[in-house]
């Protein structure tokens, strides 16, 4: 598995992925794709068999109450997985790293993420929630 980290997230997430032996992981900026629109980036993600990591969850999985109804992955029949890190507006690097670490622990438990989403969310009550589901829904 290799992660592609969205440009809205810290480059340090790549370092964490590499430390955890996901050595082919990279960042949108490092690959020269900075500024690409989501619809331009999606074919690159899919063709490269990347597991995409973003905080722009709604753009890729659609609304939280109806994932897959809209968003870049709504019409994708097969993908290498999507990791959504959900936190407050302007989430800092430390929180991004904490949420990504939790996602990596979830992947240690079950590494098969093909056609799945892992969402790690810092809820309003400061609890961390981990949600894993199929996308597209079966």
Write out the residue ranges for each language-model feature:
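Extreme N-terminal starter segment of soluble prokaryotic enzymes
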Residues: 1-2
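Glycine-rich nucleotide phosphate-binding loop and flanking beta-alpha elements
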Residues: 11, 59-61, 126
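Acidic, metal-binding active-site segment of PIN/NYN-like and related structure-specific nucleases
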Residues: 38, 45-67
């Amino acid at each position: 598995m290799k992660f592609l980290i969205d440009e809205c997230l810290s480059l340090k997430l790549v370092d964490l992925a590499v430390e955890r032996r996901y050595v082919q992981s990279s960042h949108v900026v490092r690959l020269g794709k900075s500024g690409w629109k989501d619809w331009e980036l999606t074919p690159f993600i899919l063709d490269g068999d990347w597991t995409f990591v973003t905080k722009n969850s709604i753009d890729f999985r659609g609304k939280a109450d109806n994932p897959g109804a809209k968003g870049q992955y709504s019409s994708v029949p097969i993908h290498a997985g999507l990791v959504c890190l959900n936190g407050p507006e302007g989430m800092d690097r430390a929180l991004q790293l904490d949420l990504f670490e939790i996602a990596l622990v979830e992947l240690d438990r079950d590494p098969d993420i093909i056609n799945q989403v892992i969402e790690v969310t810092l809820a309003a009550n400061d609890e961390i929630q981990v949600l894993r589901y199929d996308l597209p829904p079966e």
